[in-house]
Amino acid sequence: MGKNIFFEQKGPFFLGELFTALQFKKKIKIFDIRNLQQATNRDLTFFDHINYISLAKSTKAAYCITTARLKDYLPKTCVPILVKNVIFELCRVTRQFYPNADIDSPDLTLKNSKKIKISKVKFGNNVLIGKKSKIGKNSIIGSNTIIEHDVIIGDNCTIGSQVVLRNSLIGNNVVIQDGCKIGLKGFGFIPL
């Protein structure tokens, strides 16, 4: 996974800024929060379930949010940050790096598809497309559909009518039925 194209990132942060209740010997800068597999020695990661032991053992992360029960699976190069609830702390820290990621703001860059030149794509009526969106060849987009900024749709896709696509990377040969909303905020929760 490369750079996050959907959300503005803040940081870097000192580790002590992210975990104010903990004491750290050094002033270490953390540049991003990533999963176990993609984290680098400049990143923070998280490890919350034994299903990810193999990934934990090979992570390149500098620090890892985890529990006392799982810490021994991390490599010596990764310092465990012990917490009671990994998912809660992950959400709290992620919000510092990506403070607007949980807000569904309207896309003010939308333009009518008739004003945008995309070859080999068929559009229904009243289709709106955001800035830097890409639609693959031989795709069909139904009427009254909104494709927000930075969304990428592959080749040979059929997107139904009254669909909203946000924060999404859609592969090739995908069919999305009428009325679907993909990439919008759902009914998430943080277990306490």
Set out the residue ranges of the language-model regions.
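Terminal amphipathic alpha-helical/low-complexity segments used for targeting or macromolecular assembly
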Residues: 1-114, 173, 179-180, 184-192
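Structural signal for interior beta-strand "rungs" in well-ordered beta-sheet cores
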Residues: 46, 110-192
